Amino acid sequence: AVVNGVNYVGETTAA
């Protein structure tokens, strides 16, 4: 997912 312009890979929950 992309959150605030930061890409999280292998995430379960991203904030």
Curated annotation (Swiss-Prot):
Compartments in which it is found: Secreted
Domain of life: Bacteria
Keywords: Antibiotic, Antimicrobial, Hydrolase, Protease, Secreted, Serine protease
Stated regulation of activity: Inhibited by PMSF and p-chloromercuribenzoate. Unaffected by EDTA.
Role noted for this protein: Diaminopimelinoyl-alanine endopeptidase. Has antibacterial activity.
Quaternary structure annotation from Swiss-Prot or TrEMBL: Monomer.
Name assigned to this protein: Endopeptidase L4
Species of origin: Lysobacter sp. (strain XL1)
Native organism taxonomy: Bacteria, Pseudomonadati, Pseudomonadota, Gammaproteobacteria, Lysobacterales
